[in-house]
């Protein structure tokens, strides 16, 4: 059997991280087991569907690398087939026309409530004489179409939850509507009609759709179509245990794209929201996720969207990326932020890449690299007031340490991390001071900050000329500003 799975978002907003997780699991399944991953835009709600939202869905999926295998299906273009399927149901005696008005139905619900009962449609229109139905239709009386729910039970073997069964008398309000009085299909009918046409073999979606599944299975059966497998994924909650929403912060894939999150890190993070690869594995490349993915690892328990975990995950992926690849991402950001122009970065390519190697292993996002890189680029450095207060508290002593370091380093023949470390350790011993007493004033001189990578790494990445110039500039500043 060829597996055919689909992701079917409604274009009424951004691509939510929950939707992206669903798309990812569908995509991983076909990459692992073979088949096609399809995209359907469920745009039947014309009042809320927008082209902007459709573009956001496309852009989000493309950024994540979740490419679909066939032309996009637009549900709204299938209206005639939806109506034809409803007509088949009516002709087969599986559905019937309902002439009850909204007011009449409200009265029935109120009566049921007064009796302390749940409302179930009483099938009064199903008992109409066929000639009466024909007469009303010919007279132009508005009607909806209801599916005739049979007695018994509807069950399926869910890939996540195991066997799920619904007594048919507990399905919604009884005979449910499949076509509105304006001749537009209800969600459950349109979904089944499209899934049949698209030859979908597995429906993988959020477990908030479990209650829709028995209705859909009944429609499949009534249309004489093969019933696909179902897999209902756990919901994604915020840290407070409630369904993830905007009040928890960013929930759109596009938001994280612009916050310095890497697509492969987002995929890795999303994959662990409802799936376990086993063996306590967390950090994975996309090929590793494909290799390890199994429906047996899908989880029932609601997943928690932890932004700090996402940032940690992103840092892991960022640290493993080659500097050249990091440069492709951050260079446009550095240029657009006005920190440096591309010509400058190109002219210092080796030092630029060395600096990225230095920063990427400590950064959580690409945005952090952009914010931290300025001190490592040509030009003077701005001294942070807090760094001056802490690192240069004893200004005369700091100037002495910096001057000695500049003198020692200027005579160093080989400017590499090992040589720099040996040189500065000898200097600390010669001066009879601790490493911190020497390194901290130098750190402020080189970066203007109190926190940075190791001093030897900084010197190696900056190179001889810029490092010595920074130390000389710091001497001058400390001389001018005294104690």
Predicted regions and their residues:
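A generic structural motif
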Residues: 43-45, 197, 204, 317
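A short glycine/serine-rich beta->alpha loop
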Residues: 9-15, 203, 426-432
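Short, solvent-exposed beta-strand edge segments and adjacent coil->beta transition regions
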Residues: 12, 70, 199-200, 251
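Glycine/charged-rich beta-loop-alpha catalytic/anionic-binding loops adjacent to active sites
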Residues: 5-9, 197, 248
């Amino acid at each position: 059997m060829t597996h055919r799975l689909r992701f079917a978002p409604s274009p009424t907003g951004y691509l939510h991280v929950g939707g992206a997780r669903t798309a990812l699991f569908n995509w991983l399944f076909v990459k692992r087991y073979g088949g096609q991953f399809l995209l359907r835009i469920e745009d039947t709600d014309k009042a809320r569907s927008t082209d902007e939202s459709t573009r956001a869905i496309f852009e989000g999926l493309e950024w994540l690398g979740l490419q679909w295998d066939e032309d996009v299906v637009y549900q709204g273009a299938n209206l005639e087939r939806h109506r034809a399927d409803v007509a088949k149901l009516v002709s087969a005696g599986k559905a019937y026309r309902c002439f009850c008005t909204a007011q009449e139905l409200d009265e029935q619900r109120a009566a049921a409530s007064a009796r302390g009962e749940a409302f179930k449609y009483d099938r009064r229109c199903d008992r109409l004489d066929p000639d009466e139905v024909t007469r009303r239709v010919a007279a132009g009386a508005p009607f909806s179409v209801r599916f005739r729910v049979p007695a018994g039970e509807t069950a399926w073997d869910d890939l996540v939850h195991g066997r799920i069964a619904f007594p048919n008398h507990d399905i919604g309000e009884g005979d449910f509507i499949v076509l509105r009085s304006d001749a537009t299909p209800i969600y459950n009918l349109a979904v089944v009609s499209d899934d049949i046409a698209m030859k979908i073999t597995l429906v993988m979606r959020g477990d908030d759709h479990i209650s829709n599944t028995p209705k859909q299975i009944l429609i499949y059966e009534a249309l004489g179509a093969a019933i696909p497998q179902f897999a209902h994924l756990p919901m994604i909650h915020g840290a407070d245990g409630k369904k993830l929403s905007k009040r928890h912060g960013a929930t759109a894939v596009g938001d994280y794209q612009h916050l310095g999150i890497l697509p492969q890190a987002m995929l890795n993070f999303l994959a662990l929201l409802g799936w376990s690869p086993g063996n306590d594995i967390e950090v994975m490349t996309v090929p590793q996720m494909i290799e390890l993915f199994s429906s047996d690892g899908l989880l029932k328990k609601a997943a928690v969207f932890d932004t700090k975990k996402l940032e940690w995950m992103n840092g892991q992926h960022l640290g493993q990326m080659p500097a050249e690849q990091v440069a492709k991402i951050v260079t446009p950001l550095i240029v657009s932020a006005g920190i440096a122009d591309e010509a400058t970065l190109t002219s210092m390519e080796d030092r630029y890449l060395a600096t990225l190697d230095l920063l990427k292993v400590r950064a959580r996002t690409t945005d952090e690299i952009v914010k931290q890189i300025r001190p490592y680029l040509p030009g003077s450095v701005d001294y942070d007031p807090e760094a001056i207060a802490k690192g240069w508290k004893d200004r005369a002593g700091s100037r002495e340490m910096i001057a000695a370091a500049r003198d020692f380093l200027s005579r160093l023949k080989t400017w590499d991390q090992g040589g720099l470390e040996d040189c500065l350790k000898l200097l600390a011993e010669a001066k009879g001071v601790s490493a911190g007493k020497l390194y901290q004033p130098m750190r402020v001189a080189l970066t203007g900050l109190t926190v940075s990578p190791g001093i030897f790494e900084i010197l190696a990445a900056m190179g001889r000329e810029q490092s010595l110039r920074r130390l000389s500039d710091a001497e001058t500043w400390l001389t001018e500003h005294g104690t």
